[in-house]
Amino acid sequence: MSNIDKLNDHELVDLKRDIERELKRRAEGPKITTYYVVSCITDAQHFTDMDCALRCLKRVTEDLMEWVAESPENRDYVNRCTGIVGAKLQVEEMNLDHFNMCVAEKYFDDICYPPETAQ
């Protein structure tokens, strides 16, 4: 472990946050990492696999770029969306029970973004 005296203020805050998160995680039980992708023109899509989420992000970003290029009104709409991301990939954790419930409800969109086949 690194010497705490050598850490700057930002590193100390990050370390404190990481320790608090780890203590909470251990107290609440196992967590599963999930992902979601959202844009200012789409609904959120949720994933268990990072590669699927990244394929979705690529498609959402390309669609957003095409949509913005279609008209000045679309460009103006995106510019008015202050505080709302153009396109975003977010990493989340959910507890195991909630994850299993979501899987049973077919909540995740991984099936919509299968690996691309080799050309």
Swiss-Prot record:
Superkingdom: Viruses
A Pfam family annotated for this UniProt entry: DUF5448
Name of the featured protein: Eaf protein
Organism of provenance: Salmonella phage P22
Lineage: Viruses, Duplodnaviria, Heunggongvirae, Uroviricota, Caudoviricetes
